[in-house]
Amino acid sequence: MTTMKRLLGLLLISALFASCSSTSIINSWKDPNSNDNPDKWDKVLVAVQSPSDLKRRVAEDEVAAMSEVLFASYTVFPDKSVVQNEEALRRKIQQGEYDAIMTMRLIDQSKQTSYVPGSYTGGYWGYHSGYWGGYYNPGYYRQDSYYAIETQVFSLEENKLVWSGITSTVNPSKIDRAIREVALMTFRQMQKDGFIHPTR
């Protein structure tokens, strides 16, 4: 089985997972002029941009664990100073013989307050609670946290961006679960866009 196609096994999981997921795709784009074939890639470097080195490592490990063709960038660039040195960065990537780089970064974070209306128990009769003994659950205000993450894929053969997508995650409880949701939804969207294809 070839390279990126090994990721397609995750799509069955994501299809089952999507109904209860707090992550959704906002938009995506595929380069219509690219001639590189992601289905034949053998090595893809995963680079998560984060001010926290610990969060970067946790996130990259979570994504890299999904396929043997994915590799965490911190294992190649443990020192951030190397990433800031373009020449050293290019040399490291060439030595590793990578086909592509997939980057992930937080591009927006916001909070929204909404009102959740109250409800009556007992159906129709609940509205006449004083007489029929129904029960009223009062409404309340709820604050939700939204995180938008941008994922970009760069072809090293063509030296350009070939796919990008943005996801929105609501009220993530744990970083590893959130990044797993983002990755699954992202791979699923790649298939929808025709960027990667099912094994024939």
Question: Can you say where each PLM-predicted feature lies in the sequence?
Answer:
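Surface-exposed short loop/turn segments
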Residues: 86-153, 157
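C-terminal motif of bacterial Sec signal peptides marking the signal peptidase cleavage site
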Residues: 16-19
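Short, Lys/Arg-enriched N-terminal segments with co-localized hydrophobic residues
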Residues: 1-3
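C-terminal/domain-edge helix-coil "capping" segments
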Residues: 21-41, 51, 138-200
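Short, low-complexity, polar/charged sequence segments that are solvent-exposed and flexible
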Residues: 63-68, 120-125, 170-173, 183-186
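Sec-dependent signal peptide recognition
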Residues: 5-10
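N-terminal segment of the mature soluble domain
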Residues: 42-111
